[in-house]
């Protein structure tokens, strides 16, 4: 029996969702002198942050302790261009090819399941974990990737780790950790029509700042969060790190259970019934204490875009850019080529990217397709649509979404991280402005000198059609053929 089965244990002291999962996984409690020892239920691995960790195991003659609780895929360095069966994938660099082939070798040596070329579940690691049902409520989940918090949408405690820690988990299935503080962000009320999960999380980060959640695990709560589907909840939790948080979590509910039921790695029969009973206890108790509380009115949220080079520079698409409050804000405005007092709406666009672990799931693609249907990408604009996994791509094609995108003039790509991190050959050119559904708008994130505006799939798709940043509500009505 793994520790995640014990999260429903009763306690006389009101506990938060985070407390319950943390307590159930402590192998050894922390002291003033030493961190606690935390058991890890699921270790996700990809090609970029794992090679050095496997090398350390080889140097020390160690084996992977729990290959059955380790799941690998290739995503960061993989090309998204089509290629024929039997051909070598068109890697951008020899280093990228070496990373993929090294992971293939390491996983084969240690008996780890790898969703590589030819797998029906290859894709972005934070898409395929939930898709397979490997991500489940009450688990502890780690990955050598900043956006591991995505899996917190299922009531799991999920966070990114460094390469050294990747080695620790491979060798021991445990991590030395001090317990973070807790924060609850409550988004109550009803959002306006067309407001997406991406708009909600950009509004949250704009409210609390890029360091507002530092040292904390955030629990997202409130009626607007509960109203989100699972893909939307994953989008919210995905960007917790952009607020400085260690992780983000949402209590599991009937929406969660319905989404998980029948997936490849979830329990079945009586074991499923028992799991549901356990998972229902994964809620913060009445009276549970949080170190910080933030309240946000859902009705106040508008379609959001960023104007600067940090994720907390989100504003409503038609709102004026605020006056700079610091040298970093002045620098950001200069880099972006924008002016305070003017809205981001109307800014000319060069490329649009719809994808990433934030927004590459089937509901994200449907949202973008609804805008693009019957329309054409503006002249001179390049639009890339990159599904999050082979399975997402197949479902989108079954629904005809790929034809909507290609008929509009967008490029329909193979799955991968793609332009989010721009290490696979998908990137912008110096000086170009990219409207992106990814999670980071740092200088050069999508290529040297590239300027990034973060947005929802609907807002990104609308920018591709209009040729400039625009409120997607202006294109919500179906186009006439």
UniProtKB/Swiss-Prot annotation:
Keywords, ordered alphabetically: 4Fe-4S, Amino-acid biosynthesis, Branched-chain amino acid biosynthesis, Iron, Iron-sulfur, Leucine biosynthesis, Lyase, Metal-binding
Chain residues that bind [4Fe-4S] cluster: 357, 417, 420
Leader sequence residues: none
Metabolic or biological pathway: Amino-acid biosynthesis; L-leucine biosynthesis; L-leucine from 3-methyl-2-oxobutanoate: step 2/4
Ranges in coiled-coil conformation: none
Names of required cofactors: [4Fe-4S] cluster
Catalysed reactions, semicolon-separated: (2R,3S)-3-isopropylmalate = (2S)-2-isopropylmalate
Cofactor note: Binds 1 [4Fe-4S] cluster per subunit.
One matching Pfam family: Aconitase
GO molecular function, one term: 3-isopropylmalate dehydratase activity
Metal-binding among keywords: yes
Gene Ontology biological process: L-leucine biosynthetic process
Role played: Catalyzes the isomerization between 2-isopropylmalate and 3-isopropylmalate, via the formation of 2-isopropylmaleate.
Quaternary context: Heterodimer of LeuC and LeuD.
Protein name listed in UniProt: 3-isopropylmalate dehydratase large subunit
Lineage, highest ranks first: Bacteria, Pseudomonadati, Pseudomonadota, Alphaproteobacteria, Maricaulales
Gene: leuC
